[in-house]
Amino acid sequence: MSNEVINVLITGAAGQIAYSLIFNVCKGDMFGLDQRIKLHLLDIPQMVDSLKGIVMEIQDGAYPLIADTVITADVKEAFTGVHYAILVGAMPRREGMERADLLKANAAIFKVQGKALAEHANKNVKVLVVGNPANTNALIAQVSANGIPKENFTCLTRLDQNRAKSQIALKAGVNVKDVHNVIIWGNHSSTQYPDYRCGYINLSTGKTPISTAIKDEKWLQGEFISTVQKRGAAVIAARKLSSAASAAKAITDHMHDWVLGTAEGEYVSMGVYSDGSYGVPEGLIFSFPVKCANGKYTIVQGLQMDDLSKNLINLTTEELVAEKTTALQFLSE
């Protein structure tokens, strides 16, 4: 077991997603089975007693990887010295709230957290934003965090990728572990583009393109895409609560692969700072296919685009540009 202890911050730590996520971290699913961790758990003041109960459960679980815990409602205390920041907490969209109102409320939150990262966190802190609208919240945090590399800011689209892989596996009648390189492009919203074209399935006959294994182009270009785009809303309709355990699993997958690396030839989807790849404007947090090694990601280059893909990527790009414009206006107020 490593003697080095890493400091890991989870915001919104008393919430549903965090309740599943915290124990994934404790078990070593995120950073490996020999990495000791000091957990920083942040929530609003009225939730601190709930955090105390979670720490009791961590203690009662006797997790050998947990070196220490910090529970706090103080931003400075929470962000001090953190190596990894998982920003789950955000203002939820309430009934009757316009999207602009949601962007304004969250711009204020993530401006504060971006500044806190710059002032108190480790200078190479790696940041994953989960709270929605995740792409634009991540951008606000990045813009507000002077001195921290922009490539250190990411947002979660791995849940969408996992949903897409699962739909392909169900349609093909295979185990989800045999489905590879399904991509999510763009925004973590209903405009996202789930892309099967570069994906393949490991069948008994060998590596098989998804379009060959599933001979149903109408489904692949229609129902598959819309099912993944609307899956979050479908979970809420059925459960009366948003996705929690599946979101925690996706957060764990995202951080694990970013820190420990992806398998050879494997693509994963991450919302990252656009460098102009695939015609996406620079300065957006946009979901791309990436490969990870040595704690860094690189955007997969050279993938071919058909007309459908170009159109769907343009749609989600337009939405992100509009979100960015609105959010930055609020920042300047």
From Swiss-Prot:
Keyword terms of this UniProt record: NAD, Oxidoreductase, Tricarboxylic acid cycle
Top-rank lineage group of the source organism: Eukaryota
Sites where the protein binds substrate: R93, R99, N132, R163
EC class (word): oxidoreductase
Catalytic residue positions: H188 (proton acceptor)
Role this protein plays: Catalyzes the reversible oxidation of malate to oxaloacetate.
Oligomeric form and interacting partners: Homodimer.
Protein name in UniProt: Probable malate dehydrogenase 3
Gene field: mdhC
